[in-house]
């Protein structure tokens, strides 16, 4: 019997999720993250073999498996309530990783099932840490990615998305000694360099008829979700953050898998 490969589980929202062709060009960074790993040209993609949630996708690489369990509209709260964290826990093994990116939907006061007060964000993230500790796996916290929010700000500047949640996650990671990758900061800096117009190529700005067989066939001007180019750019930023991580050796296995 073949030894099971170590896995990197992804728990998050629509900005991380893998999508089917009918949603093109919408793409989550978790859908293309595998492209930054050694042997990416040999990657086998399939539905996750041991998940009961049909949107879950596995990316089987020579040295590791990326198991994307992210789902649109989920916060750290309703992701857990729906049993999605338990779904990961049921298959997690010693040596695995769990990357956790939430914040976008936690801030949605209009939807009670999603909302988490910033002051309680750490408390809402704790079960993800506990699942990893029980399995002797490594939890990695990731701050929410940037939005194209320049149109809403004076002088067209990009600012951190959901800053109170970013700050709460950073404080929680420090308190619990959890590796943290500040993807929110790094992608905001990327957007600032790319500029307001350039970022339309990263986010889900689509002309009517551009994708006639897609759910976005009528066009879209979406400043939260990503196109393929944006997902690849943001996944590349995450790769850089992993390589630069120097707080301890907990990410060394993943560093060795990156190209």
Positions of the model-derived regions?
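Serine-esterase "nucleophile elbow" of acetyl-processing enzymes
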Residues: 1-70, 86-94
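Short, solvent-exposed coil/turn elements at secondary-structure transition points
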Residues: 14, 72-74, 145, 186
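Short, acidic Gly/Pro/Ser/Thr-rich loop/turn segments
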Residues: 16-17, 76, 107, 188
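Sparse, context-dependent recognition of short Cys/His-centered cofactor- or disulfide-binding micro-motifs
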Residues: 18, 51-54, 64, 77, ...
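Acidic/histidine-rich helix-loop elements
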Residues: 19-27, 70-79, 110-116
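Short, solvent-exposed coil/turn linker segments
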Residues: 44, 74-75, 182
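Alpha-helical cap/lid subdomain in secreted, periplasmic
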Residues: 81-232, 236-259
């Amino acid at each position: 019997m073949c030894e099971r490969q170590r896995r990197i589980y992804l728990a998050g929202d629509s900005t991380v999720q893998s999508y089917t062709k009918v949603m093109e060009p919408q793409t989550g960074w978790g859908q293309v993250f595998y492209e930054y790993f050694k042997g990416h040209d040999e990657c086998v993609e399939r539905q996750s073999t041991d998940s009961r949630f049909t949107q879950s996708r596995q990316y089987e690489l020579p040295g590791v498996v990326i198991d994307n369990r992210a789902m649109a509209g989920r916060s750290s709260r309703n992701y857990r309530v729906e049993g999605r964290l338990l779904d990961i826990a049921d298959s997690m093994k010693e040596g695995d990783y769990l990357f956790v990116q939430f914040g976008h939907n936690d801030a949605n006061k209009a939807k009670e099932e999603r909302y988490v007060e910033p002051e309680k964000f750490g408390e809402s993230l704790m079960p993800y840490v506990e699942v990893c500790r029980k399995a002797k796996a490594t939890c990695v916290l990731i701050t929410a990615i940037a939005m194209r929010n320049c149109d809403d700000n004076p002088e067209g500047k990009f600012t951190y998305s959901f800053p109170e949640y970013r700050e709460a996650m950073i404080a929680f990671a420090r308190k619990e000694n959890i590796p943290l990758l500040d993807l929110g900061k790094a992608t905001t800096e990327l957007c600032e360099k790319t500029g307001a117009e350039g970022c339309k190529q990263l986010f889900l700005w689509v002309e009517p008829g551009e994708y006639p067989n897609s759910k976005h066939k009528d066009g879209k001007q979406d400043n939260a979700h990503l196109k393929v180019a944006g997902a690849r750019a943001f996944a590349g930023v995450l790769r850089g953050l992993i390589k630069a991580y120097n707080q301890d050796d907990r990410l060394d296995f993943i560093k060795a898998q990156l190209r």
